Amino acid sequence: MGSSESAEARRVSFEMDEEERVRVLQGIRLSESVVNRMKDCSQPSAGEQLAPGPGPECSVPVPTVPQPTIPVLTVPSPSVCGPAEGTYKAPQGDFKVSRAENSDGQQSSAVKEDLKKFQQEQLAVQDELVKVARKEKEATEKHLKASLPKKKATHEQQQSDRLTRELKNREAELSRRDTFYKEQQERIQEKNAELYKLSSQQFHEAASKAESTIKPRRVEPVCSGLQAQILRCYRDHLHEVLLCSDLAKAYQHCVSTARKG
């Protein structure tokens, strides 16, 4: 009899509410805190919802998870709910639920702490990067400002050296051309002297040969007296030249006679 009664007392049936969640347990009375805790357990835990990625730039908001509390279980008296042996299984299930909730809360708390620590480290790293970038920029600007005069002086010195080299090269080229032109001029003068000497020698030889082949002749003027008279007549009678016509005829007759003779 006792074993059959205890077996019947251990049978606990469950019922579903309108939202298909376990709400009513027949054979055991649950306190309001246990019911609320079971409602919370039916929803996905914060540890399951939150899965922070390894990306350094994203910040995942962490939902606030209430701290787990030990549920208070009110066990009815044997006179109301039956034998005490029938109510032995329910507290164990409640403690298991609260223990799972406690572990979920600890996990979410650890995740929250890790995320907070990661965000703090990320902010610190970003601050350090900003400081390093600022220092590098300042150092670069300082180096550029300091190197500008040096670069300018170096550029001017290089330009001066280049112009000096070009001037020396031009002077050397002019000197070489001057020497070349002087040599050419001396050669031309020597050739001209040789040509003049040769031409003079050839001219004298040709003149000597011509003198030896051509006999000299004495030439006397023909009718020189008449020529003098004609010139005097023309000078005295500039406007009456016809008066000198007789002298001109006599001169022509004299020349014709000299040719025939």
From Swiss-Prot:
A motif (Cx9C motif 2) lies at residues 244-254. The keyword S-adenosyl-L-methionine does not apply. Residues 154-165 have a biased composition (Basic and acidic residues). Residues 220-261 form the CHCH domain. A motif (Cx9C motif 1) lies at residues 223-233. It is a lipid-anchor. Keywords: Coiled coil, Disulfide bond, Lipoprotein, Membrane, Mitochondrion, Mitochondrion inner membrane, Myristate, Phosphoprotein. Residues 39-59, 81-114, 140-165 are annotated as: Disordered. Pfam families: CHCH, MIC19_MIC25. Residues 109-202 form a coiled coil. InterPro entries: CHCH, MIC19/MIC25, MIC25. GO terms for biological process: cristae formation; DNA damage response. It is found in: Mitochondrion inner membrane; Mitochondrion. A lipid is attached at G2 (N-myristoyl glycine). The modification Phosphoserine is found at S13, S31, S33. Disulfide bonds join C223-C254, C233-C244. One of its GO terms (cellular component) is mitochondrion. Component of the MICOS complex, a large protein complex of the mitochondrial inner membrane that plays crucial roles in the maintenance of crista junctions, inner membrane architecture, and formation of contact sites to the outer membrane. Component of the mitochondrial contact site and cristae organizing system (MICOS) complex, composed of at least MICOS10/MIC10, CHCHD3/MIC19, CHCHD6/MIC25, APOOL/MIC27, IMMT/MIC60, APOO/MIC23/MIC26 and MICOS13/MIC13. This complex was also known under the names MINOS or MitOS complex. The MICOS complex associates with mitochondrial outer membrane proteins SAMM50, MTX1 and MTX2 (together described as components of the mitochondrial outer membrane sorting assembly machinery (SAM) complex) and DNAJC11, mitochondrial inner membrane protein TMEM11 and with HSPA9. Belongs to the MICOS complex subunit Mic19 family. Metazoan Mic25 subfamily. This is MICOS complex subunit Mic25. It comes from Rattus norvegicus (Rat).
